[in-house]
Swiss-Prot record:
NCBIfam families reported for this sequence: PRK02693.1 (NF002736)
GO molecular-function term, one example from the UniProt record: electron transfer activity
Compartments (UniProt record): Cellular thylakoid membrane
PROSITE patterns linked: CYTF (PS51010)
InterPro entries noted in UniProt: Cyt-f_TM, Cyt_f, Cyt_f_lg_dom, Cyt_f_lg_dom_sf, Rudment_hybrid_motif
Required cofactor(s): heme
UniProt subunit comment: The 4 large subunits of the cytochrome b6-f complex are cytochrome b6, subunit IV (17 kDa polypeptide, PetD), cytochrome f and the Rieske protein, while the 4 small subunits are PetG, PetL, PetM and PetN. The complex functions as a dimer.
SUPFAM superfamilies according to UniProt: Cytochrome f subunit of the cytochrome b6f complex, transmembrane anchor (SSF103431), Cytochrome f, large domain (SSF49441), Rudiment single hybrid motif (SSF51246)
Binding site for heme: Y46, C66, C69, H70
One biological process term in Gene Ontology: photosynthesis
Keyword entries, A-Z: Electron transport, Heme, Iron, Membrane, Metal-binding, Photosynthesis, Signal, Thylakoid, Transmembrane, Transmembrane helix, Transport
Membrane topology reported for the UniProt record: Single-pass membrane protein
Protein name: Cytochrome f
Length: 338
């Protein structure tokens, strides 16, 4: 009988294999970290930053937290039906208007098109409709389902969208499924509020509190500008000599344009650059009624009863008028004969 001898890797081979795997892991992590350091993530129209930093995107004051990073105010619009029936799919149309002829400052200081993003806070129980519930005619208007992301697993009624190319998604159609109080006891018929937050373009402040390169940069101290050093990547350093002789260096990233020159005297907080931001954030609130089908039927029956009553009254009035006219004719004939 022949036996096949199984060979096992030596200890040295095992260690070498482990080292190779470890090196691959370290190189991968290094690439990821360096990409974030060398090419920092832009303060774009990223609603998920609110998701990462706030349990609820709407503060007690009613303000949506996206406004903390997007400082300029811009309009936002939303259109929904006045009322919907339970377990039905309807459209929530969000419009994020902006001037398509302008370009924004990108993370590297170059100019590029604006992106858009939105957070739609639907009433409790309202969610994005599943693919199989969206009517065919509505599918032509609605984008891919992966565009719509829930704010959290337990907040399916709060929907995030973006960042998306503004040229294609200035108008976003949300397919919304209304709840059914017959199967969801936490929902009742009545009037509910809907809150929209929408932005176009990059933000001015990161969630960490640091400025992006899409913001105004100011003098950190009062004094005289002694030197301005511009780097090849578009960034600059502005040196300010204060009254006590101290030199302060303000660093300006690539993107904002300097509006000061050497020898100029500046006050503390004075703008050293222009405001490169062309985007902004808008908020809009509206209402929707979850209507009971029985109430609709009752209202229709009530209106039908009123209409029928009015018709009967008109017919009765005409009948009385005919009888009265006949009686008048008889009296007139009797008077003539007498």
């Amino acid at each position: 009988m022949n036996f096949k001898v199984c060979s096992f890797p030596s200890r040295r081979q095992s260690i070498a294999a482990f080292v190779r795997v470890l090196m691959v892991i370290l190189l991968t992590l290094g690439a990821l970290v360096s990409s974030d350091v060398l090419l920092p993530q832009p303060a774009a129209a990223y609603p998920f930053w609110a998701q990462q930093n706030y349990a609820n995107p709407r503060e007690a004051t009613g303000r949506i937290v996206c406004a903390n990073c997007h400082l300029a105010a811009k309009p936002a619009e939303i259109e929904v039906p006045q009322a919907v029936l339970p377990d039905s799919v309807f459209k929530a149309v969000v419009k994020i208007p902006y001037d398509h002829s302008v370009q924004q400052v990108q993370a590297d200081g170059s100019k590029g098109p604006l992106n858009v993003g939105a957070v739609l806070m639907l009433p409790e129980g309202f969610t994005i409709a599943p693919e199989d519930r969206i009517p065919e005619e509505m599918k032509e208007e609605v984008g891919p389902s992966y565009l719509f992301q829930p704010y959290a697993d337990d907040k399916q009624n709060i929907v995030l969208v973006g960042p998306l190319p503004g040229d294609q998604y200035e108008e976003i159609v949300f397919p919304v499924l209304s709840p059914n109080p017959a199967t969801n006891k936490s929902v009742a018929f009545g009037k509910y509020s809907i809150h929209l937050g929408a932005n176009r373009g990059r933000g001015q402040i990161y969630p960490t509190g640091e400025k992006s390169n899409n913001a105004v940069y100011n003098a950190s101290a009062a004094g005289v500008i002694t030197a301005i050093a511009k780097a090849d990547d578009g960034s600059a350093e502005v040196k300010i000599r204060t009254e006590d002789g101290t030199t302060i260096v303000d660093k300006i990233p690539a993107g904002p344009e300097l509006i000061v020159s050497e020898g100029e005297e500046v006050a503390a907080g004075a703008a050293l650059t222009n405001n490169p931001n062309v985007g902004g954030f808008g908020q809009k609130d509206t209402e929707i009624v979850l209507q009971s089908p029985n109430r609709v039927k009752g209202r229709i029956a009530f209106l039908a009863a009123i209409t029928l009553t009015q018709i009967l009254l008109v017919l009765k009035k005409k009948q009385v008028e005919r009888v009265q006219a006949g009686r008048d004719d008889l009296l007139k004939a009797a008077f003539i004969a007498g």
